Swiss-Prot record:
Protein family (similarity comment): Belongs to the GatC family.
Molecular functions per Gene Ontology: asparaginyl-tRNA synthase (glutamine-hydrolyzing) activity; ATP binding; glutaminyl-tRNA synthase (glutamine-hydrolyzing) activity
Gene: gatC
Name of one Pfam family that matches: GatC
InterPro entries hit by this protein: Asp/Glu-ADT_sf_sub_c, GatC
Superkingdom in the source lineage: Bacteria
Organism field: Vesicomyosocius okutanii subsp. Calyptogena okutanii (strain HA)
Protein name in the entry: Aspartyl/glutamyl-tRNA(Asn/Gln) amidotransferase subunit C
Membrane spanning stretches: none
EC number: 6.3.5.-
Amino acid sequence: MSLSENQVSQIAHLACLSLNEAQLKDNTQNLNTITSLFEQLANIEIDGVEPMLHPLHMFQRLREDVVSEKEQLALFQSIAPKVRNGYYLVPTVIK
């Protein structure tokens, strides 16, 4: 599927974009390149290929869950404009 400059111009209008002639030609070429890549993907033969959840057939070794930062609540609350009972107070946005 190939897009014409007229179609790209309509897409740009719907996206509230203003394109000059050079930008229109460039974007038309770029979008046609992208759609041709999707066409290539659609034509790949995948019969007999099992879906996989992860490309690697091994489990990821995870590090031990250890606290790596020191407690800084008092420091952060000391520079906050308003704090009450350990909570930051902010202006009401929705009533």
